[in-house]
Amino acid sequence: MRFIEEFINKGYFHQCTDLDRLTAITKETKIAAYIGFDCTATSLHIGSLMQIMILRLLQQHGHKPIVIIGGGTSKIGDPTWKDEVRKIVSKEDIAKNAEGIKKSLSKFIKFGDGKSDAIMLDNAEWLDSFNYLDFLRDFGSYFSVNRMLTMDSVKLRLEREQHLSFLEFNYMLLQAYDFYYLSKHYNCSLQLGGSDQWGNIVMGADLIRKISGKEVFGMTTPLLTTSSGAKMGKTAAGAVWLNEDLLSPYDYYQYWRNCEDADIVRFAKLYSEFTQEELNRFESLAAEDINAAKKQLAYELTKLCHSEQAAKSALETAVKIFEEGQIDENLPTVVLEKEVLQAGISAYELFHEAGLVTSKSEARKLIRGNGAKINDRLVEDENMIINTNFLLDKKVIKLSAGKKRHILVRV
């Protein structure tokens, strides 16, 4: 199966500047294509997983993936579909975040010097040295303010009479220049991104056409939500991170294991590398086979992101907890100073300290709703004092929020 054919078959396609021509070119030759990522956290989360799988697909078909870290544009902020001004990231945080993002990506694609090896660039390398007057002189006349004002990302803010700073307005110009720079210096002929980036991508392609006459393309992916409308990458407990220092492989496994029934087939197509025969089997699942399919999906996605050993460990932990009722040492763990337990801590505060809830009020609500357990026993009093008497084997306390979220507190 060819790259574009598989791209469409997996559900990645939303829009392209010239799909027929791009299909023909990618059949005849290998291209370089790029995707940009925000440099605002030390890890990517599953909201970026489709873009990562596209980079992986590019590489598998012999094309060269280029990853752009927005070290330059992160200093400004992208207004695209945001209701509020973006927080500006410091240089120190950008460097730290870039390292973590490469760690996320390296789980899925190979970086190196080979023809199809991925490269990662920070657009600060060329944007930081910009002379503003030179930029206006050389590129300003190619951009139409009239057109920029019609873009949904800008129009939405203007219609709501929300603040849109000059800094953010310039983001579009800088992203367009990124594409031009990569076309000129890396022979990049395709920019990929979410459908909310369409206007920025087209501006870049137009800039290249006007200046150099090169044939380049833009292609976007659909914006994804779960079948219930929830945003991909976010849960009540926080983001579903790809790096294990922010989210354990077990919790990653559990996210996919607990996906909604209606999402199984779509997630299998988007995020896994199941064969067509296996995908066909997913599409014709009987009701009694759904849980087994979820386990298979969770196992494969955890193996892809972490390792086969991590997937096996996560599966074994889940079996012990949910099917055998045991406490497993591989559960996510937090450490609490022994002095805290010796003095005693209220149940709701302990759930908050352990990170199972994001606030003390949420902890109270969890307990009042009969959703909290300590050592598998229901917590009925939010002010109940938890002390060293609750330690199992004198070393751990098991906390549970609902049926599917568990954590061990160690001292």
From Swiss-Prot:
GO MF term set: ATP binding; RNA binding; tyrosine-tRNA ligase activity
UniProtKB keywords: Aminoacyl-tRNA synthetase, ATP-binding, Cytoplasm, Ligase, Nucleotide-binding, Protein biosynthesis, RNA-binding
Name of the protein this chain belongs to: Tyrosine--tRNA ligase
Role of this protein: Catalyzes the attachment of tyrosine to tRNA(Tyr) in a two-step reaction: tyrosine is first activated by ATP to form Tyr-AMP and then transferred to the acceptor end of tRNA(Tyr).
Subcellular location: Cytoplasm
Domain of life: Bacteria
EC number: 6.1.1.1
Residue span, S4 RNA-binding domain: 345-411
HAMAP family: Tyr_tRNA_synth_type1
Residues that hold L-tyrosine according to the record: 34, 171, 175
CDD domains in UniProt: S4 (cd00165), TyrRS_core (cd00805)
InterPro entries: aa-tRNA-synth_Ic, Rossmann-like_a/b/a_fold, S4_RNA-bd_sf, SYY-like_C, Tyr-tRNA-ligase, Tyr-tRNA-ligase_bac-type, Tyr-tRNA-ligase_bac_1
Subunit and interaction comment: Homodimer.
GO terms under cellular component: cytosol
Major localization listed first in the record, in broad terms: cytoplasm
Motif 'KMSKS' region, chain ranges: 231-235
Keyword check for Transmembrane: no
PROSITE patterns assigned to the protein according to its UniProt record, in alphabetical order: S4
SUPFAM superfamilies for the chain: Alpha-L RNA-binding motif, Nucleotidylyl transferase
EC class name: ligase
Gene this protein is translated from: tyrS
UniProt cross-references to Gene3D superfamilies, sorted A to Z: HUPs, RNA-binding S4 domain, Tyrosyl-Transfer RNA Synthetase
Binding residue positions for ATP: 234
